């Protein structure tokens, strides 16, 4: 690893048996207009040449770290990445996807322009073999409150935010302070659960639907394979999401309770005083 104290962004790329696609992902990162980022590749126990391909790129990035671990799933791999981040901001990148040249520059500059926002998001393309890239929505941008951002994450298929992690940039300090982790018991939607847990503790989000990320939809992807295990994982994820939302709202209600009681007490005292004077 060649560290640079001036780097602001870490790109966490978790990979597993992606020898067919990894070189493409890394080549596009090499073409970034802003190279002031660290690339952290977590190999989750690949049994093909994924690790060797990643290692061959080590000297081509300004800051690069490759970590190989036993296969435990994407959530555990991302959690290891969270433990290793040492830059102010970080973002996730899947090993079979690729990005536009402005990808890293956009996130770094967006946080510089919107320092009070705790998350920055971008738009994305959906890509399939033999088909042209399709942007997911029309260009829009702006700032969202906490609740607005949560609704976008939980929103429709054409939401410019959605629940993915790869089109979002996070503040490392906030994740550390809140001890946020990916749920390793979930096979699906662990990214959406993480995003809700994160957003419920934030002050706001800056979003743009300008597409900078290419989401490669593979026919053999686990996301597109239906099974009972996936069904129950989705059920568990939705339970976690709404528990997080209601827990935060309940805590917010309790935090206002002393003010409410003080107002009620003052109101009662004034009524007693009025009764004595009448």
What are these regions (language model features)?
Residues 90:
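Short aromatic/hydrophobic "clamp" motif used to bind/position activated sugar donors
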Residues 95-205, 213-230:
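Donor-binding/catalytic cores of nucleotide-activated saccharide
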Residues 17-31:
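Short, well-formed alpha-helical segments that are part of the catalytic scaffolds
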